[in-house]
Amino acid sequence: MAEGKAMSEFLPFSRPAMGVEELAAVKEVLESGWITTGPKNQALEQAFCQLTGNQHAIAVSSATAGMHITLMALKIGKGDEVITPSLTWVSTLNMISLLGATPVMVDVDRDTLMVTPEAIESAITPRTKAIIPVHYAGAPADIDAIRAIGERYGIAVIEDAAHAVGTYYKGRHIGAKGTAIFSFHAIKNITCAEGGLIVTDNENLARQLRMLKFHGLGVDAYDRQTWGRAPQAEVLTPGYKYNLTDINAAIALTQLVKLEHLNTRRREIAQQYQQALAALPFQPLSLPAWPHVHAWHLFIIRVDEQRCGISRDALMEALKERGIGTGLHFRAAHTQKYYRERFPTLSLPNTEWNSERICSLPLFPDMTTADADHVITALQQLAGQ
């Protein structure tokens, strides 16, 4: 859907692009008699190995679950430190904290909102066990430089690729090597309502992740050879129940087939916004300097009151009154109650400046050109108020 009329009702910040194909995929699973983890999970994992070029893929119930068991598999715990930007979804910091480790929050580049190799390296101590860079809003972080730091210091790198299905860095899909975690949450570029997936080139890590995601058993929830759980399965280590159902996996597979089309439409809307914003005081994010393909998970503007004549919160409220939804990605983690009290002296100037000004505009594949024009017209009316 490219042209068309604007939505007559409220234009949400995001909406999943679901069609008859997803309904048919769910129907097929329901009629198969195997509705929990099964062949659709295996197909999804194989498809992500093909997409990324990585060796192993492990489907899980959410990206948060994936982060939890990845940190556990790396034996991160009390006394350890994990470097992460503060400008990220709080689940990463929560998982680090729940394992007894310390999140070491670092600043981001002011205009791309990417964590920088320099910020990461300056935060390394003898206690650092992992680095978690975020591929933010659909653009890639400078992962070669970050991975080189990890290799130099012997520190694991876990890529937060929740925004990065369809993101390419120097000609390769994010997650082509190392370990990366993707999200299939409802607002993501492909979705199955809730779900996630880990890719890795570490066979031992992959084996541990499969155990940890399913009760610590020595097999996955489904085994192709026995058409069910092997009867000799036993607990090898305490684990969780983070497996993905085949209902969800079937939806994700169907969405993955549409990925190029879905992301092309996102790119068209983003270009429409970019052209209009050139004449407005609202500041979009800068694009990374390295070669990349942007997945346009989010389209973010910065609303500086002195420059724009209106505050971010006032703009979001005014857009809501005009029938337009917005998002905030993210409120800096270190400014939120628990982390503010835990790290009261932490100052991250670029993160804080942006956290007070960022606003995510509506961006989803089923938006029409008229929908985007509606947003642009509202921004034009509100600029300078």
UniProtKB/Swiss-Prot annotation:
GO terms for cellular component: cytoplasm; membrane. The modification N6-(pyridoxal phosphate)lysine is found at residue 188. CDD domains: AHBA_syn. Homodimer. Keywords: Aminotransferase, Antibiotic resistance, Lipid A biosynthesis, Lipid biosynthesis, Lipid metabolism, Lipopolysaccharide biosynthesis, Pyridoxal phosphate, Transferase. The keyword ATP-binding does not apply. The keyword Lipid biosynthesis applies. It catalyses: UDP-4-amino-4-deoxy-beta-L-arabinose + 2-oxoglutarate = UDP-beta-L-threo-pentopyranos-4-ulose + L-glutamate. Induction: Induced by BasR. Belongs to the DegT/DnrJ/EryC1 family. ArnB subfamily. GO terms for molecular function: pyridoxal phosphate binding; transaminase activity; UDP-4-amino-4-deoxy-L-arabinose aminotransferase. InterPro entries: ArnB_NH2Trfase (IPR022850), DegT/StrS_aminotransferase (IPR000653), PyrdxlP-dep_Trfase (IPR015424), PyrdxlP-dep_Trfase_major (IPR015421), PyrdxlP-dep_Trfase_small (IPR015422). Its EC number is 2.6.1.87. One of its GO terms (biological process) is polysaccharide biosynthetic process. Its cofactor is pyridoxal 5'-phosphate. SUPFAM superfamilies: PLP-dependent transferases. HAMAP family: ArnB_transfer. This is UDP-4-amino-4-deoxy-L-arabinose--oxoglutarate aminotransferase. It comes from the Bacteria.
